[in-house]
Amino acid sequence: LGDVYKRQLRKYLGLNELHLLGQSWGGMLSIEYLCDHKPEGIKSVILSSTHPSSKLWAHEQHRMIKFMSQEDQDAIAKAEATGNFDDPAYLAANERFMLLHAAGVPKDTDPECLRRPKKIGTDSYITAWGPNEYTPIGNLSNYEYRDKLKNIKEPALIINGTNDLCTPLVAKTMYDSIPNSRWELFDDCRHVCFVEDTDRYCRLLNEWMEQND
């Protein structure tokens, strides 16, 4: 059904040929699409702050948690052990973790689309992934494509930030496994390189698509 939906969506939009960009969860979908369905007409793929393995992702998040204060580490460990993700100490620790590695509070100078209030799909996030970035216990807990990455034949641009949830190890895993790939690491960027270094990000995409068009 998923393959039929993707083919029909592309047909409806007239996307016979395209450059496929997947950011975060979108990158996971892109990897699944290329590995399992082997579609035609994909000129290149941009895998932006994404991952090929829920297990690897969780491992790297827990590694970064070790750089937090002992108080925050204990609060997170307690929440994972008890399953109580409503404790104020945990919520504060998780907020600090996300501030370090996901994104900051929008500034007054940021575009309106970033500043306006958002409706966050908490239920769908928990169902698909879990209560946070480092506890994948949802439907995607068994997402594992590391051994299939070698089957991606399209040119692949891998992007992540030095402070990203998508750590350099996660990005390097994709780079090492995808035959025709290029890796660009953004200094001092978190999970939203396109926000925190917009000019470089857009220049890179334009250059990449021109080279692979």
List PLM regions with ranges:
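Short aromatic-enriched loop/helix-cap "lid" or pocket-rim segments at secondary-structure transitions
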Residues: L56-Q61, A171, E196-T198
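Conserved hydrolase catalytic core segment
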Residues: N16-E60
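Conserved loop-alpha-helix segment in the C-terminal half of the alpha/beta-hydrolase fold
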Residues: R146-C189
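Active-site acidic short loop of glycosyltransferases
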Residues: K11-E17, P39, K153-E154, N180
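Catalytic active-site module of serine/aspartate enzymes centered on a nucleophile-bearing elbow/loop
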Residues: S181-D213
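Short, small-residue-biased leader/transition segments that mark boundaries at the very start
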Residues: L1-Y5
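Alpha/beta-hydrolase
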Residues: K66-E154
